[in-house]
């Protein structure tokens, strides 16, 4: 069969299934493809195809992830599902699979369990902005009051992590019934309801090009008679010739004007998200700007040294540390294009962190870096990656 052409007519949204082990995340993923395949909006993927997820390496970390894609009337979705709990943790922290929203799967028979809680916390920490709940295995609970209690418990749990628990859609159903072709209320009807809720409740993400301009500086050189050029890949937004930008991070923030934009040795009027450009900067000396700083729309990003983060520490097998680390650990933090030394504070009651752990830490950098919440970083020792993290909140 010929490969169908990817139609770019519908808006694209990235989602994923999260939740406790054996609550039915993979079964639900398979059920969604089955129900939508009947409408010609997906290719059916069986449980085993999704469960035997290939391992991928993201920033030196091995993660098993399954990717499926499907469409609804309104949208095109890319959906990630992970076989193991550790894979979820790694995925969410590294941003390997950036989620615009998530489907939290909770078994009606068990209610929220430890990993339910941990995945909600992670979603909050790493900036997964929206959650829709699928209350699975609802056919195993005969007591309507019990179902209502579980639903209430889920709403309270979501609210305790600053999600709008009262407003979040909760759809009851049985992923297994739907996967087996049952057309009743808990079977494929529930899947249709779920996808309607995802369509309606999870908004389209803001595209990189619509965000304020930011370009990490990778290299700097001077062109005699013309001035200083900073090169890098535009991360977001657009910069036009003649616009004012700020140089942020490492040193005191300064303003300059972009007097030229070059790409592949051609002069352009503007540089856009995704472009590798050279920006000619007015009145900037070669020594005023360095790798690790960013060019950004004035006022859109500020430099910081102290922040809270969620981090995953690589195992020995992944090429990480062989031993635990303790409070006051001083590795390098690699942000965008450069390493900065930082001191790690562990949470109260945590004596040490073992390879393979994930942990909430407070970090104090020795030099300021341009950052906002959600920024990803690597933790390195002498150029070797030993962990990955994401900024969850900025302190100063």
Swiss-Prot record:
Reactions catalysed, as given in the entry: GTP + H2O = GDP + phosphate + H(+)
Residues covered by region (G5): 174-176
Region of interest: G4: 136-139
Binding site for Mg(2+): 26
One Pfam family from the record: GTP_EFTU_D2
Family statement: Belongs to the TRAFAC class translation factor GTPase superfamily. Classic translation factor GTPase family. EF-Tu/EF-1A subfamily.
Its biological purpose: GTP hydrolase that promotes the GTP-dependent binding of aminoacyl-tRNA to the A-site of ribosomes during protein biosynthesis.
Name the record gives this protein: Elongation factor Tu
Species the sequence originates in: Geobacter metallireducens (strain ATCC 53774 / DSM 7210 / GS-15)
Gene: tuf1
């Amino acid at each position: 069969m010929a490969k169908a052409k990817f139609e770019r007519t519908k808006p694209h949204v990235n989602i994923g299934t999260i939740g406790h082990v054996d609550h039915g995340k993979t079964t639900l993923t398979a059920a969604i493809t089955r129900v939508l395949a009947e409408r010609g909006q997906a290719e059916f993927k069986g449980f085993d195809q999704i469960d035997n997820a290939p391992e991928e390496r993201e920033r030196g970390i091995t993660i098993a992830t399954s990717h499926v894609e499907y469409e609804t009337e309104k949208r095109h979705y890319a959906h990630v599902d992970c076989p193991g709990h550790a894979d979820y943790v790694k995925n969410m922290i590294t941003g390997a699979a950036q989620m615009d929203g998530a489907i939290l799967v909770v078994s009606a028979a068990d209610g929220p369990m430890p990993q339910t809680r941990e995945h909600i916390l992670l979603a909050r920490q790493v900036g997964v902005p929206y959650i829709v709940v699928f209350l699975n295995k609802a056919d195993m609970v005969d007591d309507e009051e019990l179902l209502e209690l579980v639903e209430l418990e889920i709403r309270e749990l979501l609210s305790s992590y600053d999600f709008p628990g009262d407003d979040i859609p909760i759809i009851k159903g049985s992923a297994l019934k739907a996967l087996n072709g049952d057309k009743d209320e808990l079977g494929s009807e529930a899947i249709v309801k779920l996808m309607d809720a995802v369509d309606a409740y999870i908004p389209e993400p803001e595209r990189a090009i619509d965000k304020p301009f930011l370009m990490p500086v990778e290299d700097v050189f001077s062109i005699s008679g013309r001035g200083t050029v900073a090169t890098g890949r535009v991360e977001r937004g657009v910069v036009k010739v003649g616009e004012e930008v700020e140089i942020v991070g490492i040193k005191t923030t300064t303003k300059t004007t972009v007097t030229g934009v070059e790409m592949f040795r051609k002069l352009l009027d503007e540089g856009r998200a995704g472009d590798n450009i050279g920006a000619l900067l007015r009145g900037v000396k070669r020594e005023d700007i360095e790798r690790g700083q960013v060019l950004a729309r004035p006022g859109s990003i500020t430099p910081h040294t102290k922040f809270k983060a969620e981090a995953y520490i690589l195992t020995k097998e992944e090429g990480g540390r062989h031993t635990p680390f303790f409070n006051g650990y001083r590795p390098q933090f690699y942000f965008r294009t450069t390493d900065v030394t930082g001191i790690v504070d562990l949470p109260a009651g945590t004596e040490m962190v073992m390879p393979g752990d994930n942990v909430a830490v407070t970090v104090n950098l020795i030099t300021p870096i341009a950052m906002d919440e959600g920024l990803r970083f690597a933790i390195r020792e002498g150029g070797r990656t030993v962990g990955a993290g994401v900024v969850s909140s900025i302190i100063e």
